[in-house]
């Protein structure tokens, strides 16, 4: 945050609050490099060291200065309108610079808003994307109906630009951003296709994530207003899970705007038991009341997307299910509410009664089939889950190979240790362990059995299964710690800052 403030103040001293001159500053690309680390579980670093070298950045800025007012030739659509050539290489660097620049004012405004609201400490304490699950465990066991909603996308490019212009008053920068998106991202068509959106998100992940989050923030700000108008209660926990993009100040601004524009009470139904949770482009809406009220909320969503954002959404894509009979997928987990029945014997004087007690418990299950599919895509096993070697890693040393597999196994273990049933997680560990052994045997041109017998690597490879137990035995008292209890209980790791690949595939 301090870096953003320093760079923006430096630009303001030169160009009267304009953002577009920052695209020609070297420190912007250095900041983009420092933030651009791959956080995927299965993939390795994408080679940003070469792309963000000082020589390439200087060459990029020099060529942008040499262009004749960014004139675009209609006869050569493959040329870069900024540089004239090397489109794929330099456009990604520029997109990272755009993402950093456009985030700067929003982060600064968010910082001041958080300081005014005095919630900096509580925000820093929420370090894990698993912070959603305690909310689900507390609330969903008392609810009856759930709706699994996917926020519609793509949205037209011009609508995104117009939404941004409400909050950043820099016309030249947005002309430059519109020019960049139109020619680099193939968003010239009236409605962007899903293929073009997918290509753009892979080539320009940071800029795509910012634009998508800002669109979702705009939609959720309106939804929050509707939610507060439809309930007697004001839920303080409602805003905890929003992306940190100017939400708190925007919420205050919305209250002022709507209080002036609407002098009468909107005729919304009163539903104090509705709960909303979202991560990325997927949200869960749950309620204790009858499906009729959930249906009304569904059509509110549809009309909001169609009328305000010009995004078409079909009513049949939003299903309303009974929570005790259907599971929903969120954050790479399958979750449902399980009914636990128990019989209690009660005695009063000479009479004995049998009382059946039904309690609800939220079950969070590891999705074994999607996980195996992801491992197969990353070439750790086949589609049936049989481990295979990883020949592309055979050039590395034995220590590096084992460390890579252990890192993946550790990330998966930390992410899925909160599951109710861990047999699926142990199967994934077993696949990674055998894949590691086969990779080492392939490197040494030997069979698995001969390699293990010759090198004695069995004890070293036991780290796939024993590392978690050793760490937890240091945290918990030894007299109360047992392996059986560890296997049975759910343990949420609060240092999970990366996103699981399965979350993006939902």
UniProtKB/Swiss-Prot annotation:
| Biological process according to GO | mRNA processing; RNA splicing; tRNA processing
Question: Gene Ontology cellular component?
Answer: chloroplast
Q: Which domain of life is it from?
A: Eukaryota
Location comes to:
Plastid, Chloroplast
Entry keywords, A to Z: Chloroplast, mRNA processing, Plastid, RNA-binding, tRNA processing
**What family does the Swiss-Prot or TrEMBL record give for this protein?**
Belongs to the intron maturase 2 family. MatK subfamily.
Q: What does this protein do?
A: Usually encoded in the trnK tRNA gene intron. Probably assists in splicing its own and other chloroplast group II introns.
Quote the protein name from its UniProt record: Maturase K
Gene that this polypeptide is encoded by: matK
């Amino acid at each position: 945050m301090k870096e953003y403030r320093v760079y923006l103040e430096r630009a303001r001293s030169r160009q009267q609050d304009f953002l577009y001159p920052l695209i020609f500053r070297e420190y912007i690309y250095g900041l983009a490099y420092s933030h651009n680390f791959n956080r995927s579980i299965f993939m390795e670093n994408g080679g940003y060291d070469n792309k963000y070298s000082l020589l390439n950045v200087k060459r990029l800025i020099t060529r942008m200065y040499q262009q004749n007012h960014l004139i675009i030739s209609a006869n050569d659509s493959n040329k870069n309108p900024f540089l004239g050539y090397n489109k794929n290489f330099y456009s990604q660097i520029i997109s990272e610079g755009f993402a950093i620049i456009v985030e700067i004012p929003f982060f600064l405004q968010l910082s001041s808003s958080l300081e005014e609201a005095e919630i900096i400490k509580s925000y820093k304490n929420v370090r894990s994307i698993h912070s959603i699950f305690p909310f689900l465990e507390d609330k969903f066991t008392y609810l009856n109906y759930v709706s699994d909603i996917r926020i519609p996308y793509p949205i037209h490019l011009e609508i995104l630009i117009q939404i941004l212009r409400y909050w950043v008053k820099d016309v030249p920068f947005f002309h430059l951003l519109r020019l960049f998106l139109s020619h680099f991202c193939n968003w010239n068509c009236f409605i962007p296709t899903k293929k073009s959106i997918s290509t753009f998100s892979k080539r320009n992940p940071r800029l795509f994530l910012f634009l998508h989050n800002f669109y979702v923030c705009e939609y959720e700000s309106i939804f929050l207003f509707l939610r507060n108008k439809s309930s007697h209660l004001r839920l303080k926990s409602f805003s905890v899970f929003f992306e940190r993009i100017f939400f708190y100040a925007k919420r205050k601004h919305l209250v002022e705007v709507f209080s002036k524009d609407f002098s009468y009470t909107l005729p919304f139904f009163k539903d104090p038991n509705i709960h909303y949770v979202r991560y990325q482009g997927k949200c869960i809406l749950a309620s204790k009341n009858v499906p009729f009220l959930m249906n009304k909320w569904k059509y509110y969503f549809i009309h909001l997307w169609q009328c305000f954002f010009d995004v078409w959404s079909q009513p049949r894509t939003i299903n309303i299910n009974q929570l005790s009979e259907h599971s929903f997928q969120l954050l790479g987990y399958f979750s449902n509410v399980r009914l636990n029945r128990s019989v209690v014997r009660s005695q009063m004087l000479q009479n004995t009664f049998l009382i059946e007690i039904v309690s609800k418990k939220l079950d969070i299950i590891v999705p074994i089939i999607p996980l195996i599919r992801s491992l197969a895509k990353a070439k750790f096993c086949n589609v049936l889950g049989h481990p295979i070697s990883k020949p592309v890693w055979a050039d590395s040393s034995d220590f590096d190979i084992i460390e890579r597999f252990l890192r993946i196994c550790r990330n998966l273990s930390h992410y899925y240790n909160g599951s109710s049933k861990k047999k699926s997680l142990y199967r994934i560990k077993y696949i990674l362990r055998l894949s590691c052994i086969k990779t080492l045997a392939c490197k040494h041109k030997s069979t698995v059995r001969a390699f293990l017998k010759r090198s004695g690597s069995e004890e070293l490879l036991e780290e796939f299964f024993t590392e978690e137990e050793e760490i937890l035995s240091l945290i918990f008292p030894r007299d109360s710690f047992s392996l059986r209890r560890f296997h049975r209980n759910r343990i949420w790791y609060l240092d999970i800052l990366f996103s699981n690949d399965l979350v993006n595939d939902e």
